[in-house]
Structures are given as structure tokens and as C-alpha cells.
Amino acid sequence: MGEKLILIDGHSILNRAFYGVPDLTNAEGIHTNAMYGFLNILFKFLDEEKPDYITVAFDLSAPTFRHKAFDGYKGTRKPMQPELKQQVPLMKELLKAMNITVVEQEGYEADDILGTIAKESAAKGIDVSIVSGDRDLLQLADEHIKIRIPKTKKGVTEVEDYYPSDVFNLYGVTPHEFIDVKALMGDTSDNIPGAPGVGPKTASAIIQKYHSLDNVFEHLCELKPPKAKTSITENIEQIKMSRFLSEIKINVPIDYKVEDSKAGDFFNENSYELFKKYNFKNMLKKFENTDIIAKDPECYEYFKKISDFAEVENVFNKAMDIAGGIEKIGLSIVRESELTAVGITLSDTEIYYIPVSGFVTESYLADRLSDVVSVASNRNIASANIKDYLDIFEKDKINGYPLVSEKAFIDTAIAAYLLHPSNESYDYESLGREFLSLTYPSKTELLGKLSIKKAVNEAEDNLIKYVCLSSYAYYKCADKITEQLKNENMYELFETIEMPLIFVLFEMQQQGISVDKQALVDYSKVLGTKISVLEKEIYEAAGEEFNINSPKQLGVILFEKLGMPNGKKTKSGYSTAADVLEKLAPDYPVVSKILEYRQLSKLKSTYADGLTQYISEDGRIHGTFNQTITATGRISSTEPNLQNIPIRMEMGKAIRKVFVPKNGFVFLDADYSQIELRILAHMSGDEKLIEAYNSSADIHRATAAQVFGVPLDEVTDEQRRNAKAVNFGIIYGMSSFGLSQDLSISRKEAKEYIERYFASYPTIKTFIDGLVSDAKEKGYSLTMYNRRREIPEIKSSNFMQRSFGERVAMNAPIQGTAADIIKLAMINVYNALKEHNLRSRLILQVHDELLVETAEDEVETVKQIMLDGMKNAVSLKVPLEVDLKEGKDWLEAH
């Protein structure tokens, strides 16, 4: 078999990848989707072809001989998107780092370079594959030159291959004749005029018959069809120019030797650094069999399973000695239904896997882990997702609270989240890549779909790697993460908010919230009855029964049978999304019923029926509170999501009635009043807004007076309602369109409201504009506590993406600060309840609201604790107000 050369049309493949891969950015906000897609295509062809040589050709921005010959050449092309343009030099740099030859030549296009290299190489007996999305290159096909055109559909890349026979089968002409076909038909993408009115089929038919333009010109009188005859006859010089522009040159004067473009050594230290920089996580695995990172054989060498009791004792004793000082240990805990094994890293050469076995029982491991934790107070224990394992260290308690210092731990997952809150994962594999420049096999790669219990018996070697790698990664990256947090001024956020919060959330999960099962059943029945009534009313209005939950069937009923306006039909049918139906609802009662039917059906399936599966044997729901999910810093809840309970509709509110305190207790519910507006007043420094809050004015009435220019006592309810919508809309970067939808007014009126608002509060306008400009400059926003949110969209050339980024830039500092403040309040309340040795417990947080299950004889004390803890969480230029209520169920307390 002869030698092989792959030639790649750089701009063509990069452009194709840019539009075929969703927008991606790295931590610095650099767009990377085109590079990522390019590399995927590159690796596909490298795997298939296994070439001896590889070269990539790029166009230069300088004019070529074609531009000089024809001023209009490519004159209709739109400018390259900035996000793509940014990636062109980066792609070249990356290719060079991979030791792939990159060729450019002033005055010529990449096609000419590819043609020249291909023909010269083929003449030497080298088999050439040209990879491009440009069919112009079909003219280069011969027995030794294959044109490969990749096409990506639904994420799957398929390749069309063309030798001369394939070109003939498609167009009925030879590759050389294909130039003449293009000269006749022209090319709108390159602004090559051709013969006006002559399309691909006619051009192909003419060249099939006459085989060359010269022969066509000699037989003008007999050309068919008549329109083509006229056009060609009248545009001979233009057609000749089009042929000149269409023909790829194969004699470009370039300094190139195919022998210097050998394929190999793609995965080296230089390319690794760039792959890591651009966050090409999946591709980093390609470096595993190199000397650059492999799988860190040095640490693998020191992985050791120990089950001898005396040896285990020695490891724990040494761990206590280290944890009691200032050095760190790495700790990974493996547990599904029960504790299975522990990974402990004491140093670079002491990495242990300790399974539950023989005398090393589950309770023994828990006791010894508690011993280690009890002596640590300098964030000596590096681990991840500590909240999931705190119950293991509960050997000693006071009033139900574990005697574990939060300063014992550094949670590497939470620390990494603060640095990059938009990342998908913060596991050991991600930490290794991000902070250690190491690529580790993932848990899935090591264990597949095996449970831990099965892995103990069926894949213990890989289980040992998984457990040891985890503890080793936590141990190795802890100091580096700490250093980065300090460099980014986020360590205080980590130290004073996120780490203490772990213990608060753990206690909330342990406590759970009690559910009145009978009330839940009754609620489900009420919903079921209402849904049945609505169902009948909808069928009656429609004149037939149909599946209301089927968008396709519903669309036909609404827009065809009932003839409602503005129905937009797609391939799958009419859109029946909520925003479409909400516009129809005021004029069509049946649509209002459909919207209500949907809302009640969701309430029934998600809450009335769905909550039952989460009720534990103790009659309580023990949900999970997450610290590393939202980009804004807000806590999220899952299994179930109690933060998403709808409260705008009465039946949605009613679900809160099923949540009840235990006997002898009541609920105290405290909710911050307008916290985000108060934060806006503080951060913007707007004197009018600050004065309004400091004088305890009705802020929405005060805003209405300012915006509408009326005395405070003459503000109407409608003006107040509109001002309220503007107040909150400003925080969320609401546009005039959004406000018009919210208030059911015209966009013009909404625009006037916003303009009046900013005219009344110019400092707020300046502040918000500053947030946007800062985010554009830095690529991220910051809260008062230096919580960072990356906003790559804000630099997008796409209007919709850029507008989204600007709205995020306006809102994230305010919403993120509110999230930080409620977290501080939670810590305050938790600590005060603990210090007062009370039986009352903080059990739930929903956005700006805290719920405490309060012993009846502790109500007054807890009320004061909640008010103090929330009001004094932070000192602002305006007071923080808290609405506090008491109730025998959550609805009554809210």
C-alpha cells in the first residue's frame, strides 16, 4: 500500500464546524466551538485514513489574483462572525502545536494551495485525500486524489467521497469538465456571475454534450434551450471570466515539501496545554498513552489496599497526627446503602484503599474517621461533597448537633464551583484536569454501570483506582484551589459562607419536613375533580373528545376546527406553548380552561401524587439541597424540588397546607421583603430609592409618584401595579417587550414607562449600564461578596445571545448578592438555635424565605433569633425588612 496524505481546507472545515456545533466557551470566555468541531472532524479522518502526511491550508485576508481580476469576487459574502474570526488564529496555533503543517500563500486561496500540493503529491505516487465542504474541489479528483466532503446531521458526521467516477455519476461530466459547468452556472456564494438564467442542470447538460466551453462557443447557433442560448451568446466574456475565477490553480509557488509534513506526535506537551486551556475535556483522553500525562503512573504505583487491622490502625493514627497539624490529607468515602470503603491519601506516596472487611467493620471505619475529623481544625481534610457523608462523623453530639468543626474540611467541589460556577461537574476527574493538568479515567470508565457492591467482587482493581484517585485528587488540588480562591478574592466567600453552609444544609436534610398524608390524598382528590370538570368543559367547547395533552391534537382543534388566529404550523404541528395560548386566552374562554387544566394536571402529577414517593418511614420528606448547581449561587432543592411550588394560583398555594410541624411544634416562616430592590438601592447608591426605604415608604407607590409625576397620595392602584412591574422588571433586565407582555400594554407604552423610570432614577441607569460594560470587559459579573458568574454570551455577535448576556449582567450581581445574604441568614439562624440549645430546627429555605419548625414553648425566642439573624446578615444603606408569620401548616405560616 502506498503512502497517504490528508489535505484539509482549513477555513471551510472551521466554518462548517462553527455552524454545526453549539456555542462553546472556555473559562476565559474564548469561543471554542469551531475548533472543537474541527478537531472532531480531523480525528475522524486520522482514525479512518491513518495517513503518513497531513497538511492544512488556510486563506489569508489579503486580496488574491481573483480579486484583482474581478472586483466583485466574493463581494456578496457576509463578514465572518466575530466568534468564528476569533478562532481562526487559535486554530492555526493549535494545529502547529500538534505538529501539523499549516500552509498559507498571499495572493492565492487555500483551494489553489490544496490543488498544487495534491497534484504534485499524486505525481509522486502518494494517495491524497482532500477534506473540504467546498464542491469546487471536485475538479481536482483523479485516480490518486479523493475529495471527501463531511456533512453533519443531528450530531452525526457522514462523509461523501468523490473520485472521478463519482463526479461523473453525480454531474455527468469529468472533474476537468466540472470547471466549465461552474463557469456557466456561476456561483452566488463566490459572486461568480456565469451565464444569467443558466442553472446546474442546464449547465451540466450543455457540457455533457459539448465537453468544453470552447466547443460550446463554436456551436452557439444550435444550443438548447433557447433562453440558455441567448444568455450564453450575450455573455461570452463574462463566462470566460467565470471560468478563470472557477479554475483552481495547481502551480502555486509555495515553499512546501510533503516529506516535511509527516503525521505523528500530535499529542505533546504544547498541544496538551492548549487542549486544557480550551476545555476540550473529552479529547484530553487522547494524551493518555503519551509521556505527557498518561494516567499519572507515579501515583498509581502507590495505590495500596490494606485490610490487616493493625495496618489500618497505623494509617488512621498517622492520619490523626497529620490532621491535627497544618498539613492535609485526602479523603474519599464510598457508600451506596452502606459504607463500603474509604480512600485516604497521607502523602504523594501513601495512598490507601481501606475496604470494610473482617475486623475493619463499617462502625469501626466510622469511629476512626470521626477520630480523624475531631482533631482537624485547619481545613486539613480535603474531600468533595462532604454534606453527603457528615452523618458518618456523628459519633459525638450535643442536643442532636454533631460535634464536628466545619473548619476540619475543605470541600474541593464547592471551591471549584466558586471558581467556575457554570461547569457541569466538580468530581475528581474534573479537578484533575482543571487544577493538576492530569487526565484520570472517569468513574464510568473504571466501573461502567456496576454498583459499588458488585464492583467489590467483579472489578476490585478498578474500584481501588476509583477510590484512591478520588482521595489523591482532593489531596493534590486542595492547596492549588485555595490559592486560586485567594487570588480571585473569593476565599472569604468560601470560608465564611459556603463551607459553614454545608452543615446547615446537612441538618435541614436530616430533619426533613413532615407531611400530612391524608391532606395530600384529599388535595389530590380535589385536583382530580377539578381536572375532570375542566376536561368535560373543554370537550364541550371543542365539540368532541381528544387528547388535551397532545399538542398535535390540541393544535388541530384550536386553529383548524375552532378557527383561532395566529396559528403557526411547524413540521410537528401547531405550537400550543403557554405563551401562544396566553395571548388567545382573553378572547377565548376555552383556552383559559386549557391553561388551567395544564396547571392543575402538573400540580397533581408533580406534587399531589408525586410527593408520595419521597415520604420516608418517619412521615417526613428529606429532600436534597444543592450548593453547586445554579450559576447565580442560589441553593437548589431536588428529590423533591420544594422551591418550585407554584404560589401565584390558589390551588398551587394550597399544596403548602399538607406540610405540617410535628406535635408540640408550629411553623415560623420568615421572608425577606423586596430584598433584591433593597440590594439595588444599596449597590447603585441611588439617593431617592435609599430615602424611600429609610423612610419606610411604599416603594412601589413612591416609584409610581416619580414615574408618573403625581403626588404620592394621588397614585392610583393601576399606577402602583405598573410601577411594581417596572421595579422588578428593571432588576431582571426586562425589555419593553417583556414589560408590555407583563402589563398587557403596547410596547410603546412600556418603553415610555422604562424611560420615565430611568429619568426618575438616573443613578440606577448609570449603575446598570456599568454592570453591563464591566461584564463585557471582564466576561463575568460579581456580587457584593465577589461571587463570580461567567457570561460568555455577552460578547456574542448573535443579538439574542448578546441580549441574554446583558440581562444576566444586570441581574446576576443583584440576585447573586441576595443568594449570599440568605445563606448568611441561614448560618446565623442555625448557629443561634444551636447556641441557645433549642429543640427548634431550621428545616427549609425557599428563595428569600426560611422555615423553622419551632417548639411551642420556644416561639418568642425563635422569632427574635430569626429576625435578628436575617436583618443583621449584612449592613446595607437601607434596612432589611422581614415578614414573619406563625402557623399550624406551611400555608398558614406563609
Roles of regions detected by a PLM:
Residues I344-D348, L419-S422, Y426-K449, Y466-A473, ...:
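Function-dense linear segments that define catalytic or interfacial modules
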Residues G2, P22-N26, G75-I254:
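Extended two-metal-dependent nuclease catalytic cores across DNA- and RNA-processing enzymes
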Residues K154-K182, F303, G343-N487, I497, ...:
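Active-site-proximal helix-loop-helix substrate-binding element of RNase H-like nuclease domains
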Residues S231, N235-F359, L450-I647, V666, ...:
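Conserved "right-hand" nucleotidyltransferase catalytic core of DNA-directed polymerases
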Residues L485-I497, L501, I821, A825-V846, ...:
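Active-site palm subdomain of RNA-directed nucleic acid polymerases
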Residues M1-D59, F65-F70:
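Non-catalytic, usually N-terminal nucleic-acid engagement modules in DNA/RNA processing proteins
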Residues T529-K536, E540-S592, A759-R807, N811, ...:
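C-terminal polymerase-core module
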Residues K453-V456, Q510, N566, H622-G623, ...:
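Conserved catalytic core of nucleic-acid polymerases
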